[in-house]
């Protein structure tokens, strides 16, 4: 925003130009019809051309072909399900595992109410939300890495 020059609407010369319909370069071009009718189709066609060009020039295979007669030793979910998969795998009681997964969104919902007295947007001035974010990220990465290891090393990652 610091690069864009904001118009001084108290300037009588600018007001006179605006009254005549001139001077639109002073405050930018209107979105309709310039951007919507002309720029959006150009951008969409450019992205489409890049996609088609890349798919023709570099037709890479997505993974290895499936073999219906060979079963993998351990079936793993997609990478974004690794933390929840590992959590369900290491907790012996499945009800406790499901409740622990349900406690994550419930805990995140309570954070704004705990910090409702704090009106700052700076994350360093909101210690509870920042701590919850950092601890949650570290735990999720830890559980995600542990999901790719055997069950005996799933929590310790073989470090301890």
UniProtKB/Swiss-Prot annotation:
GO MF term set: electron transporter, transferring electrons within cytochrome b6/f complex of photosystem II activity; electron transporter, transferring electrons within the cyclic electron transport pathway of photosynthesis activity; oxidoreductase activity
Membrane topology: Multi-pass membrane protein
Gene Ontology process terms (BP): photosynthetic electron transport chain
GO CC field: chloroplast thylakoid membrane
Chief location of this protein within or outside the cell: plastid
Signal peptide residues on this chain, from the entry's feature table: none
Taxonomic superkingdom: Eukaryota
Classification via InterPro entries: Cyt_b/b6_C (IPR005798), Cyt_b/b6_C_sf (IPR036150), Cyt_b6/f_cplx_suIV (IPR005870), Cytochrome_b_C_euk/bac (IPR048260)
Subcellular location: Plastid, Chloroplast thylakoid membrane
Statement: the UniProt record of this protein carries the keyword Transmembrane helix: yes
TM ranges: 36-56, 95-115, 127-147
The entry's keywords: Chloroplast, Electron transport, Membrane, Photosynthesis, Plastid, Thylakoid, Transmembrane, Transmembrane helix, Transport
Stated family: Belongs to the cytochrome b family. PetD subfamily.
Subunit structure: The 4 large subunits of the cytochrome b6-f complex are cytochrome b6, subunit IV (17 kDa polypeptide, petD), cytochrome f and the Rieske protein, while the 4 small subunits are petG, petL, petM and petN. The complex functions as a dimer.
Function: Component of the cytochrome b6-f complex, which mediates electron transfer between photosystem II (PSII) and photosystem I (PSI), cyclic electron flow around PSI, and state transitions.
Name the UniProt record assigns to this protein: Cytochrome b6-f complex subunit 4
Source organism per UniProt: Gracilaria tenuistipitata var. liui
């Amino acid at each position: 925003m610091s690069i864009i020059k904001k118009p001084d609407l108290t300037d009588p010369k600018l007001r006179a130009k605006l009254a005549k319909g001139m001077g639109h370069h002073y405050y930018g071009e209107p979105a309709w019809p310039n951007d919507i009718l002309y720029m959006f189709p150009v951008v969409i066609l450019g992205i489409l051309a890049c996609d088609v060009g890349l798919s023709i020039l570099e037709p890479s295979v997505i993974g290895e072909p499936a073999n219906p007669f060979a079963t993998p030793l351990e079936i793993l979910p997609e990478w974004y399900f690794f933390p929840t998969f590992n959590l369900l795998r290491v907790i012996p009681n499945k009800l406790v595992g499901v409740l622990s997964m349900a406690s994550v969104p419930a805990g995140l919902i309570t954070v704004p109410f705990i910090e409702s007295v704090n009106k700052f947007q700076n994350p360093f001035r909101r210690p509870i939300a920042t701590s919850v974010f950092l601890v949650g990220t570290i735990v999720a990465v830890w559980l995600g890495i542990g999901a790719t290891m055997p069950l005996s090393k799933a929590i310790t990652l073989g470090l301890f």
